[in-house]
């Protein structure tokens, strides 16, 4: 939607108790603004729906907007974007959602920046840390009876300290969805981002569950380690055809040959084309990563113990040689 949208917020103006600082971006349903609380000085992000005349399916857009706010306010976790308020401004009649402002950009931005600067893909340790944070968020999502359905690097944002936050619950689905939720879900045929979708999601969006989110997070891990998603460049039709044959994504070692074996196993387990062969719950990812960290720690201890033993032996040999010489 090019140019200014009539009736939207203007930088420098007021929106309730907030000063509008600037527009952060736009999407198909609305725009996001940076707001400042005039009383506390704190910054927030505000997602504002376009006026009714600007959105073709305004009723559905409002439904998705309110559902995102409802789910986000119901699911609390340090690695989920927090929504503080939702409503309709009495003066402008614009629908709004006030949430955390995350100045660190997205994971997608970080990956692209590293490639532009020729720094290569993300380090293993950083990639594992980020997967741990989002898997932890998924634990809270699952406990709340929700499936995210659109986990991708663009929906993982960073705060000022570099902590990852999962956002965009606009197409999330409750596992106990009623008829109203199903109507919202089925408005569009394709729900989510095809390059990150699990095979069952690509073939039938009604069959997704938390294991589909785990698959998508595995694709994000592959992207962090390789610099791009494994199926980059494939069309949606090609992705669906591949999903129907239950074909695995390419081996990460074709892009990064010297990855630790346990990381390769983690990726294969997260991205199995068959849901029953994946981790069944995000807690299992955390357990796997705990075991990986402990194994790595023990290996380092054994390595340094070996180095110390060799150093001691060399020192003793040197002393013995000196004594023999005298």
Locate each region found by the language model.
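AlphaC helix of the eukaryotic protein kinase fold
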Residues: 50-74
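C-terminal lobe helix-coil module of Hanks-type protein kinase domains
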Residues: 167, 193-294
């Amino acid at each position: 939607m090019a140019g200014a949208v009539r009736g939207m917020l203007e930088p420098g103006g007021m929106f309730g108790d907030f000063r509008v600082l600037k527009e952060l971006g736009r999407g198909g349903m609305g725009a996001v603004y940076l707001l400042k609380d005039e009383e506390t000085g704190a910054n927030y992000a505000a997602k504002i729906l376009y006026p009714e005349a600007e959105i073709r399916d305004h009723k559905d857009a409002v439904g998705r907007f309110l559902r995102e706010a409802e789910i986000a306010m119901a699911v609390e976790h340090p690695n989920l974007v927090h929504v503080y308020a939702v409503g309709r401004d009495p003066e402008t009649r614009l629908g709004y959602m006030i949430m955390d402002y995350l100045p660190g950009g997205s994971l997608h931005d970080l990956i692209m920046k590293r490639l532009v600067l020729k720094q290569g893909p993300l380090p293993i340790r950083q990639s594992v840390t980020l997967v741990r944070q989002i898997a932890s968020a998924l634990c809270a999502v699952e406990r709340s009876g929700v499936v995210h359905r659109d986990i991708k690097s663009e929906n993982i944002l960073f705060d000022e300290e570099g902590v990852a936050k999962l956002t965009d619950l606009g197409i999330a689905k409750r596992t106990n969805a009623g008829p109203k939720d199903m109507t919202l879900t089925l408005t569009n045929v394709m729900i989510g981002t095809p390059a990150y979708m699990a095979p069952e999601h690509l073939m039938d969006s009604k069959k997704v569950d938390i294991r589909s989110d785990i698959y998508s997070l595995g694709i994000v891990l592959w992207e962090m380690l390789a610099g791009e998603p494994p199926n980059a460049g494939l069309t949606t039709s090609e992705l669906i055809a591949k999903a129907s044959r239950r074909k695995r994504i390419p081996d990460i070692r074709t892009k990064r040959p010297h990855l630790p074996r346990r990381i390769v196993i983690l990726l294969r387990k997260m991205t199995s084309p068959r849901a029953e062969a994946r981790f069944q719950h995000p807690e299992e990812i955390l357990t796997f990563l705990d075991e990986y960290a402990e194994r790595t720690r023990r290996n380092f201890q054994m390595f340094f113990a070996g180095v110390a033993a060799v150093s001691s032996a060399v020192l003793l040999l040197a002393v013995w040689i000196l004594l023999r010489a005298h």
